[in-house]
UniProtKB/Swiss-Prot annotation:
Keyword Ribosomal protein: yes
Lineage of source species: Bacteria, Pseudomonadati, Pseudomonadota, Alphaproteobacteria, Acetobacterales
Purpose of the protein: Protein S19 forms a complex with S13 that binds strongly to the 16S ribosomal RNA.
Organism of origin: Gluconobacter oxydans (strain 621H)
Name of this chain's protein: Small ribosomal subunit protein uS19
Domain of life where this protein originates: Bacteria
Gene Ontology molecular-function annotations: rRNA binding; structural constituent of ribosome
Record field: transmembrane: none
Length: 92
């Protein structure tokens, strides 16, 4: 279920400070974040965030198309290794 419009988008408070500090420094370094639940805002466009997936930080370059989505959507937590193969049919 979607979030109510009157509540506005959810963003952890510390992300604003990190984003502003990164913009002020002028360097495009990766901003490490653990907040997968935060919504991507227009202020974050052009910045690179390292979103934690439970194992490592995956770099996410924020574009205009990502605004309104959550950070967690762009760093998958599970790796699909495929279903087990049928060993009998592969024998020649």
């Amino acid at each position: 279920m979607a979030r109510s419009v009157w509540k506005g988008p959810f963003v952890d408070g510390y992300l604003f400070g990190k984003a502003e500090a990164s913009r002020a420094s002028g360097r495009n370094e990766v901003i490490k974040i653990w907040s997968r639940r935060s919504t991507i805002l227009p202020q974050f466009v052009g910045l690179t965030f390292g979103v934690y997936n439970g194992h490592k930080f995956l770099p996410v370059q924020v574009t205009e198309n990502m605004v309104g989505h959550k950070f967690g959507e762009f760093s998958p937590t599970r790796t699909y290794t495929g279903h087990g193969s049928d060993k009998k049919s592969k024998r020649g």
